[in-house]
Structure formats: structure tokens, C-alpha cells
């Protein structure tokens, strides 16, 4: 850990596919980061990164670990466990992309390794840093949330085809509704399937929380357009969030009647919409800035290993419910 707050944190990026490239891009711009290098077996990609970001390229990430204090891991999900363990065993702080791992056992191993090494383990649930979600948490703080409704649709692509739509897309919203509901999940039901060979690519899941909140989540890779939305139905309002456009609208009812001087009704106001201002900061920029502050000991991770493990456990149960429809019964143990 850099003791001098004026000295940037030496950081590296492991995996420079689509997401890893953006990690390197943002880190190269952050004042608190010294992007030492990127690690990826693809030499051509590595050369492009060194030219673009002014850092070094490592064919083997292990060769980079002795030169950095922290890493961002953006490799395929199946590699999260071995790569994460190697970094933590080397005493390096870790920000790992979501999901934390491919299985609950692997997630537990990462959490235990971080604790034993005294290292940070932060998980990249990036929507926590979306300006619209940050404002949403403020708006509903004084509201009684009843129903949460999330939609996350994308066109089919060649990325992230090693995991289901639950682990690729829906897990974002699982994490968000857990944060908003602030209660254990006691009921779960899900339906979905696959449009072709490969992992599940469309799912709807319903989560029932101990405090009565119900969340409906839909994720699909069959859409021709991207949708990233979350609505909070509260006792006295409806809050609609668009994560793509970073917008937030609050719908409220009104009960005011307007009449002329002689008592004749002219019109009535049935409701109004508030447009909440949000910042224009890039969520990844905010996430990485937060990670660096955590490395310096100034903040605690917004999403640590335990929180990410809880989201993964629910994702696993949703997948099981889709594959085995007869299992949509109340959970034996609240999650």
C-alpha cells in the first residue's frame, strides 16, 4: 500500500479483452493510478495497449505481480478463481470483474485467501457506481419500497458466451435489488431457456424478501436493442431508472382540483413527474477511483467478496430453477 497519498498506486490489468481494455484506459487517466502494465497472452493486443496507454505488456501475469500493489482482473469467469488466488497469494489487492467466480466454492476460496493475505477483494458490480443508481438509493431512502422491476436486454454477441445470461447480465440486477431491499431472500421462482445451443439466454426471476418486498428481474440476449432499467414501485411514488442514459424520473400522484371563481371545475392535476439530476461521471471511472481509495485505506469496498458471493448464490439458484422448474419453492435458508 502506498503510504504517501501523493504517490500513485502501482496497478496492473490482467486480461485486455473488451472490459479489460476499458480498465486500462481509465486507469491511465486517473491521477491516483500508475498503470504499470497489462497482462494478456495475446501479443498483438498487448502491443496495442502499450502504445495506447504507455504501459508495459506481460505475456504472463505472474511476471507482473511483483511490480504492482493492485490489479484489476478482467479474464473469463472460469479463470477468476485461479488468477485471483495467484494475485492474493502474492499479496496484491484485487478488483475482480463480476461474477466473483464460477462457483460458490471458488468464491469462498477467494474470500478466505484475501482475508489470510490481508488484501482487499472488491468485485466489479459496476452498476453500483452508475450515477442514476446512486440517486435512486437517495430517492427511495425515505420511501417504502414494495416492488422492484429490472430489465436488462442485449442483442446476441460473441462476448461472454461461456456463461448464462444470469451470470453475464442478470447478476447486475440481483446485486442492485439486494442493496435496495435490504432483507434476506426467502422465496425464489424463475423461468427461461435457450434460443439455441449453449448457455441459457433468457430468464425471468422473482425474488421474495423477508420484509415483503418483491423483485422481478428479466434478462435476455434475444433483443435487438439494449435495455438497462430498474423501477422501484413505492407506496407513494414510482421511480424509473435508465442506466444507459443515466436518467431518473419520479412519478407522484396529486390530488389538487382547480376551479373557476364560481366553483365550476376547470381541470385537475392527477400527478406530476420529477426529473432528478445526475452527474455525468463514467461508472467505471467512479468504480476504479473508489478501488484506489480502498487500497489507500480511505474507504471500504462498496461490493466485497461476501456481498458478491451472495449475489452469485442467488444466480446459481435461479439457473437451477430454470433448468429444473419444479424447484421454485420457498428457500429452506434465507439468503
Identify the residue ranges that each predicted region occupies.
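A contiguous active-site-proximal alpha/beta segment in oxidoreductase catalytic domains
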Residues: 101-160
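C-terminal helix-rich "cap/oligomerization" subdomain common to oxidoreductases
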Residues: 1-5, 70-72, 210, 290-335
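Contiguous beta-strand/loop segments that form the cofactor/metal-binding neighborhood of enzyme cores
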Residues: 174-251, 281-298, 316, 333-335
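Beta-loop-alpha module in the N-terminal Rossmann-like domain of NAD(P)-dependent dehydrogenases
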Residues: 23, 53-111
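Mid-domain beta-loop-alpha active-site segment that forms a flexible
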Residues: 124-131, 155-187, 307-308
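Hydrophobic residues in well-ordered beta-strands that form the structural core
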Residues: 59, 73, 96, 121-123, ...
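Active-site loop of classical SDR/Rossmann-like NAD(P)-dependent oxidoreductases
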Residues: 41, 275-289, 303
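N-terminal Rossmann-like dinucleotide-binding module
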Residues: 1-53, 177
Amino acid at each position: 500500500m502506498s503510504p504517501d497519498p501523493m504517490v500513485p498506486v502501482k496497478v496492473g490489468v490482467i486480461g485486455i479483452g473488451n472490459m479489460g481494455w476499458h480498465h486500462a484506459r481509465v486507469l491511465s487517466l486517473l491521477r491516483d493510478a500508475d498503470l504499470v502494465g497489462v497482462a494478456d497472452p495475446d501479443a498483438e493486443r498487448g502491443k496495442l495497449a502499450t502504445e495506447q496507454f504507455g504501459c508495459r505488456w506481460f505475456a504472463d501475469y505472474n511476471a507482473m505481480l511483483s511490480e504492482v500493489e493492485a490489479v484489476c482482473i478482467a479474464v473469463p469467469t472460469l479463470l477468476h478463481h485461479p488468477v485471483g488466488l495467484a494475485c492474493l497469494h502474492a499479496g496484491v489487492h484485487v478488483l475482480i470483474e463480476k461474477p466473483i467466480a464460477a462457483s460458490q466454492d471458488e468464491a469462498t476460496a477467494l474470500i478466505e485467501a484475501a482475508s489470510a493475505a490481508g488484501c482487499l477483494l472488491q468485485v466489479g458490480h459496476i452498476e453500483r457506481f452508475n450515477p442514476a443508481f446512486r440517486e435512486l438509493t437517495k430517492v427511495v431512502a425515505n420511501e417504502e419500497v414494495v416492488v422492484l422491476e429490472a430489465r436488462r436486454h442485449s442483442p446476441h454477441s460473441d462476448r461472454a458466451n461461456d456463461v448464462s445470461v444470469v451470470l453475464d447480465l442478470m447478476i447486475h440486477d440481483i446485486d442492485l435489488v439486494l442493496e435496495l431491499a435490504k432483507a434476506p431472500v426467502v422465496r425464489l421462482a424463475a423461468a427461461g431457456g435457450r434460443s439455441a445451443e449453449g448457455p441459457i439466454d433468457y430468464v425471468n426471476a422473482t425474488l421474495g424478501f423477508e420484509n415483503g418486498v418483491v423483485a422481478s428481474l428479466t434478462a435476455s440476449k434475444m433483443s435487438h436493442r439494449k435495455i438497462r432499467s430498474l423501477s422501484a414501485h413505492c407506496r407513494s411514488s414510482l421511480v424509473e431508472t435508465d442506466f444507459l442514459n443515466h436518467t431518473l424520473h419520479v412519478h407522484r400522484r396529486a390530488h389538487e382540483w382547480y376551479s373557476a371563481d364560481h366553483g365550476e371545475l376547470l381541470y385537475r392535476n392527477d400527478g406530476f413527474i420529477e426529473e432528478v439530476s445526475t452527474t455525468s461521471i463514467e461508472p467505471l471511472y467512479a468504480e476504479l477511483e473508489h478501488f484506489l481509495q480502498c487500497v489507500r485505506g480511505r474507504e471500504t469496498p462498496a461490493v466485497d467478496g461476501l456481498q458478491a458471493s451472495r449475489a452469485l448464490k442467488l444466480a446459481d439458484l435461479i439457473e437451477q430453477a430454470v433448468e429444473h422448474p419444479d424447484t421454485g419453492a420457498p428457500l429452506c435458508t434465507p439468503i
